[in-house]
């Protein structure tokens, strides 16, 4: 999980999800793209 100031979709499979007021990027196919907005 990378913590970034700005999260972007790196691939078309990435999904942007809002949990507890934070933005997350999740990718089932390739989990190395997991990000959270700091």
Curated annotation (Swiss-Prot):
TM regions (residue ranges): none
Gene Ontology molecular-function annotations: structural constituent of ribosome
An annotated GO cellular component: ribosome
One protein family per Pfam: Ribosomal_L36
UniProt entry keywords in alphabetical sequence: Ribonucleoprotein, Ribosomal protein
Keyword Ribonucleoprotein attributed: yes
InterPro entries recorded: Ribosomal_bL36 (IPR000473), Ribosomal_bL36_sp (IPR035977), Ribosomal_L36_bact (IPR047621)
Any one of the GO BP annotations: translation
Entry-linked SUPFAM superfamilies: Ribosomal protein L36
HAMAP family noted in UniProt: Ribosomal_bL36
Family: Belongs to the bacterial ribosomal protein bL36 family.
Full protein name: Large ribosomal subunit protein bL36
Species per Swiss-Prot/TrEMBL record: Porphyromonas gingivalis (strain ATCC BAA-308 / W83)
Lineage: Bacteria, Pseudomonadati, Bacteroidota, Bacteroidia, Bacteroidales
Gene transcribed to yield this protein: rpmJ
